Amino acid sequence: MAAKDRIQAIKQMVANDKKVTVSNLSGIFQVTEETIRRDLEKLEDEGFLTRTYGGAVLNTAMLTENIHFYKRASSFYEEKQLIARKALPFIDNKTTMAADSSSTVMELLKLLQDRSGLTLLTNSAEAIHVLAQSEIKVVSTGGELNKNTLSLQGRITKEIIRRYHVDIMVMSCKGLDINSGALDSNEAEAEIKKTMIRQATEVALLVDHSKFDRKAFVQLADFSHINYIITDKSPGAEWIAFCKDNNIQLVW
């Protein structure tokens, strides 16, 4: 097995089991313990895990970022479908839109497959695949594929996005904090979303109820950039008042 494939397999094991041991990995991959230690050191440099005596543990801040797209898509699945249906009216009069690679936004895109006259700019490899036979005109951002999140990232991605302007950008995030704004755990993905936000007239944030009052590693956007927050249930009186005071349309 090539080193890059072994490291990818180790990442998946850490994501699934939350911790691994050097001796166990050495036996599984039939390489020396020193080779495994070097692999774990590389993953620690990425911020994916923390090495411990005899092994390593998953960094919890990286958990949702590195679990595979399809595994994340199954979490809060009914809530995501509900949010997608509630978001549909905000796309009705739009002809151009940008979409991130989140599983929540993917549910909205599935509902738009028969929509003619709509152009979609996205860095989601899953969206490009699912919408290949749809009525939507799909514009890919290009870039380097993150095989876990199924998103396209990097310098090229941002350069392509800057060529366009869209009526609305739809995205999700890992957390919402009244003081910090919309937060994410993946810095590379956050940079793509920030670029999309700058190229959009309006921004809609699609989040399930678990994301409110939840911290994450990277600030994605402050609330001055958000026009709509669409969720599955009331986030509480404080959030309702906050959105009203900040001219954000809150839908649940």
Swiss-Prot record:
Query: Which SUPFAM superfamilies did the record assign?
Result: NagB/RpiA/CoA transferase-like (SSF100950), Winged helix' DNA-binding domain (SSF46785)
A GO molecular-function annotation: cis-regulatory region sequence-specific DNA binding
Kindly provide the name given to this protein in its UniProt entry. Uncharacterized HTH-type transcriptional regulator YdjF
Query: Looking at the UniProt feature table, which residue ranges are given for the DNA-binding region?
Result: 20-39
Keyword list (alphabetical) reads:
DNA-binding, Transcription, Transcription regulation
- Record the organism: Escherichia coli (strain K12)
A Pfam family that this protein carries is DeoRC
HTH deoR-type domain: from which residue to which, for each copy?
Answer: 3-58
- InterPro entries reported in the protein's UniProt record: Carb_Metab_HTH_regulators, DeoR-like_C, DeoR_HTH, NagB/RpiA_transferase-like, Tscrpt_reg_HTH_DeoR_CS, WH-like_DNA-bd_sf, WH_DNA-bd_sf
Q: What is the lineage of its organism?
A: Bacteria, Pseudomonadati, Pseudomonadota, Gammaproteobacteria, Enterobacterales
Query: What's a single GO BP term from this record?
Result: regulation of DNA-templated transcription
Q: Gene name, please?
A: ydjF
